[in-house]
Amino acid sequence: MAYVLYFARRIDAQNKLMHKHVWKPTLEPGAKGKTLALYGFGGIGKEIAKRAVPFKMNVIYYCRHPNLEDEKTYGVKYVDEETLLREGDFLSLNVPLTDSTFHLIDKNKLDQMKTGSILINIARGPVIDEFAVTDALKSGKLGAAAVDVFPSEPCTDSPLADCPTAVLTPHTASSTVENSAEMNIAAVDNVLNYLQGTLDDKYLVIKGAR
């Protein structure tokens, strides 16, 4: 959600002008009324939806196993893949890396997206074709992109680094002091529960898996 708000308000661009002693107020598009398209609606997708709806965004999603109850719970709407790509002002990728999601976002999918839309990849690096995304940014097909994950990490040679409209972060989308503490506690809890023979599904990413 931080990436959505970053692009919606263009704070960085305004900050740079102020540091150059340039006073130039601008009207930015904002988030209200914009369509946030979630590709994948697991735990991360749901958490994003919970934060986007209060900003009065129109949240749509696509996944392999839609659940009508989720639509009521999170205030979102299921659409097919084609509609998701066509209507999203922001497209957030929240899927695991599998054979079917490798280069999920390639030139063909990018061509289907709304011109000027914004791509956000917080899934896994190979889910996007970096070179196709780079071309889409340079041509203006994509308005911007936020990428937190890369095909190989550490990554210091991404072609996206040459695109001023790409915001790149070193796989830190979930890296906060609070999250780190919670993950450490969860790890300790799992070890203690396992030793006591009481390990449950509380911290499982895929419920029911062992």
PLM regions: where:
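Rossmann-like dinucleotide-binding domain for NAD(H)/NADP(H)
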Residues: 116, 122-210
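Short, flexible hinge/linker loops that cap or flank conserved catalytic cores
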Residues: 28-32, 53, 111-112, 160
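Rossmann-like adenosine-cofactor binding region
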Residues: 65-159
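Phosphate-binding beta-alpha-beta segment of Rossmann-like dinucleotide-binding domains, i.e.
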Residues: 1-35, 47-50, 202
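Short, structured coil segments at secondary-structure junctions
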Residues: 55, 74, 162-164
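Residues at the starts of beta-strands that form the adenosine-phosphate
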Residues: 49, 57-58
